[in-house]
Regions:
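Small/polar-rich, solvent-exposed N-terminal microdomains that initiate assembly or binding
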Residues: 1-59, 95-108
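Generic alpha-helical secondary structure
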Residues: 5-10, 78-81, 85
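Intrinsically disordered, low-complexity acidic/polar segments
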Residues: 55, 80-82, 145
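Acidic-leaning, charged glycine-interspersed low-complexity segments
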Residues: 92-144
Length: 145
């Protein structure tokens, strides 16, 4: 099964915005018109890193997909980058008080459902000039719903 990566990515961006209260660009810096905070630091950038499929062979529509996303949080200070990354981590991994549901749902297009989420890799913080970046990779497991 191939899932619509761009549509899934847009749903993930909306989840990051809900959790962080900051703008998130799609493979680029958010524009000054991006909601809720434009291109002001801190902000997030989401990159699609591809998808793999599992389950039934030969492109069966009932197969599952694992989509990989990188989120780079950019801030003017180490604290801003780190706390922004904490909010992104909460967006992907946060659970409700009873642990039964995700704290921040990823609302997918009709016909798809999130089965799971995981932190794939956390590269941590780097600095270039006076700009700090914190890089994380997350996997989102999707099935037909």
């Amino acid at each position: 099964m191939s899932v619509p990566g761009r549509q899934i990515a847009q749903a993930v961006i909306q989840t990051i915005i809900a959790a962080s209260g900051r703008s998130c660009g799609y493979a680029t810096v958010p524009t000054s018109q991006s909601q809720p905070s434009g291109s002001q630091l801190p902000y997030h950038v989401l990159y699609e890193l591809g998808q793999t499929v599992s389950g039934p062979p030969f492109g069966d529509p009932a197969a599952d997909a694992r989509l990989l996303f990188q989120v780079t949080t950019v801030g003017a200070s180490p604290d801003a980058a780190s706390s922004g990354a904490d909010r992104v981590r909460a967006a992907f991994l946060g659970r409700t008080a009873h642990g039964a549901d995700w704290l921040y749902p990823i609302t997918l297009p009709a016909g798809y459902a999130v089965m799971g989420r995981e932190l794939d890799r956390e590269d941590g913080m780097t600095v270039a000039g006076s700009t700090y970046s914190y890089v994380q990779r997350f996997a989102v497991h999707v099935t037909t719903g």
